[in-house]
Regions:
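HhH-family (HhH-GPD) DNA N-glycosylase catalytic core used in base-excision repair
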Residues: 1-186
Length: 186
């Protein structure tokens, strides 16, 4: 919703054009990012946004779709490029949580058709981890482990293997359930 409102506003739409974004003063980019809450941490996330814009301009003349084309629209190849081969060029986006969810959102809400979409893991943010624990898929001891995100990914992959569901499909439901205090639906 925040991204859509930002895109529909002629004054803030420029943030989705990496070349145009890099031409603007820092304060203008920051203002556009926070206007509809695309960025919640104004300094840190503005820096990250600008770094991602620099990377996209440097590698693909500002068109991220060229990455998808180079990787044959294969989520595994795209993740390897972002998370392993070029991690430093993709701050935040190269993380386990965001990279999977970003690719999922692009798949769900655009006309992009990725290959191997079923390989996207659940994005193990705080809320997903809490929900995974609440459901008994990770123990109290595992909840405090430094490996809890990896464990959450593994447990959901195991549980959903051989079903019609992809692990990333459950992200939003788990996130909302935890975010709303695990309220009952009845």
């Amino acid at each position: 919703k925040s991204a859509l409102m930002t895109y529909e506003d002629a004054e803030t739409r420029f943030i989705f054009d990496p070349i145009e974004c890099l031409k603007r003063p820092y304060a203008e980019v920051q203002s556009a990012l926070i206007k509809y809450r695309v960025a919640l941490q104004k300094d840190k996330q503005t820096e990250i946004w600008l770094k991602l814009c620099e990377t996209m301009v440097e590698l693909w003349n500002g068109d991220i779709r060229k990455l998808f084309d180079e990787c044959d629209y294969d989520v595994n190849r795209i993740r390897k490029f972002i998370q392993i081969d070029n991690k430093k060029k993709f701050p935040y986006l190269s993380g386990t949580k965001i990279c999977n969810y970003w690719l999922y959102v692009l798949y769900q809400y655009t006309n992009i058709r990725f290959k191997n979409i079923e390989d996207l893991n659940v994005a193990p943010d705080t809320h997903v981890v809490k929900s995974t624990h609440k459901l008994g898929l990770i123990s109290d001891e595992e909840l405090t482990s430094s490996e809890v995100q990896t464990l959450a990914i593994e447990r959901w992959n195991e549980l959903l293997k051989g079903t019609e569901f992809k692990p990333i499909d459950i992200h939003t439901a788990l996130w909302l359930w935890s975010r709303n205090g695990f309220r009952s639906l009845d």
